[in-house]
Amino acid sequence: MELLLPHPSNSTPLTVLGFLDRAASVYGDCPSILHTANTVHTWSETHNRCLRIASALTSSSIGIKQGQVVSVVGPNVPSVYELQFAVPMSGAILNNINPRLDAHALSVLLRHSESRLVFVDHRSISLVLEAVSLFTQHEKPHLVLLDDDQENDSSSASDFLDTYEEIMERGNSRFKWIRPQTEWQPMVLNYTSGTTSSPKGVVLSHRAIFMLTVSSLLDWSVPNRPVYLWTLPMFHANGWGYTWGTAAVGATNICTRRVDAPTIYNLIDKHNVTHMCAAPMVLNMLINYPLSTPLKNPVQVMTSGAPPPATIISRAESLGFNVSHSYGLTETSGPVVSCAWKPKWDHLDPLERARLKSRQGVRTLGFTEVDVRDRKTGKSVKHDGVSVGEIVFRGSSVMLGYYKDPQGTAACMREDGWFYSGDIGVIHKDGYLEIKDRSKDVIICGGENISSAEIETVLYTNPVVKEAAVVAKPDKMWGETPCAFVSLKCDNNGDGSVPVTEREIREFCKTKLPKYMVPRKVIFQEELPKTSTGKIQKFLLRQMAKTLS
């Protein structure tokens, strides 16, 4: 058997781009994208439009070459969805960028990525023009205007050589899209959200994206023809892979610019939404909406990011949201760990079920291995739910590396064959992983390691608390002490007439936490600072805490 070797017939590179060809064949007449009353596409139309854009990018008039970077600055609108396929189909590397960045940060990413072309949503025109004004004429990328649901022509649009629909008209729907020569070929360049440090460029291969996407569909048991609501930004880890996954199952993609409670509830009711992904912030927003009522039909929700407190999951499920929890990083292409549900948990009380769901879980089907290693010895910690260590990964969807940063790559992709996440966690007796904190979020008070996430979980059980984040505050005697930042619900204690005090919050924590874990300081804010994907920006809170010392 040793003479049986790989052959071109059995070793074609894995890529998600073929999902669109199949969707056009199997689900051609089915709706692919719904946005406004005037934007309804079928999978055949979406396939046709993506091929036209890919063809236009490679034309002599635009001249994008294989391996060059093409950036997209826009929200969850149809053109941005199409570009998730069209850009890599042209042989270029897809680079989604957060449209809520400021001009300086955007210019840094465009320069670092060496982007040759930028697709720009019409509401981000001034932002992008300010960013590229910092470039020399030779450095400036080609700009193409995305005009989804644009009502009025903008005077700034004259700075754009092309519009999306114009270059599509020039494209060829019979274009033979450019398949990767190897599945290890880069497909996307994503920048980390920068909640703890400067953003890093994460390069992901066709293989990584394929394995992540298929695993996500299997792990969530996504059926054929679901109705998927885009509340998760497509620019955030490519919408965790569902930008391509929805094509694999012939889903109807419901696109929306606005992500607020009234809009979400309205779209769920109007389109009979079955699935959506949401950061814990969005769940928190939905459960605190004063006019919320139980859903007519259950909606499957996948959440990821900061560990959602059990109370938020429990309240969401009481409204009809069936919450699943996953965990991953930009560097792992998206979620690679999920809280796989066990039938024996069905009979537990709602809060206990929610507590189990708030754990991160076990590796997804397409991933190889997840472990928790002692940071001093490098050995696996005991599976006792108590022994903490750093969470490490290895599997097909781990990044190729950080773009132009070999030192940063070597620091986390180490010679022992593991990717080191920087997250702190435990493994329970049943083998399920639970994050305790980011390594930078652990508070060392008098030599004791304190998990900020544990304190936050307690704070969320207080009925007046809407948002909570705990960081280290420098202390001359103890080194560091816990400092809590809290925002309150609008109705406060019921009628809003009685203010909540710092002492009351601390006394509440004393009933549920050891004394050394009780926040020494509580700061009230109307809203905690967040990234556009809902992550609380703890580095800003740390800076505030330092000024209190």
UniProtKB/Swiss-Prot annotation:
What PROSITE patterns is this protein classified in?
AMP_BINDING
EC class (word): ligase
Biological process (GO), any one: fatty acid metabolic process
Tell me if Phosphoprotein is a UniProt keyword of this record.
no
Record keywords: Lipid metabolism included?
Answer: yes
Q: Which SUPFAM superfamilies did the record assign?
A: Acetyl-CoA synthetase-like
EC number(s) stated in the UniProt entry for this protein: 6.2.1.-
- At the top level, the lineage of the source is Eukaryota
Q: Which UniProt keywords apply?
A: Fatty acid metabolism, Ligase, Lipid metabolism
**Any Pfam family the entry gives:** AMP-binding_C
Gene3D superfamilies given in the database record: 3.30.300.30, N-terminal domain of ligase-like
Q: Name one GO molecular function term.
A: ligase activity
| Tissues where the protein occurs | Expressed at low levels in roots.
Name the family: Belongs to the ATP-dependent AMP-binding enzyme family.
Q: What does this protein do?
A: May act as an acid--thiol ligase that activates carboxylic acids by forming acyl-CoAs.
The name on file for this protein is Probable acyl-activating enzyme 10
- The species this protein was found in: Arabidopsis thaliana (Mouse-ear cress)
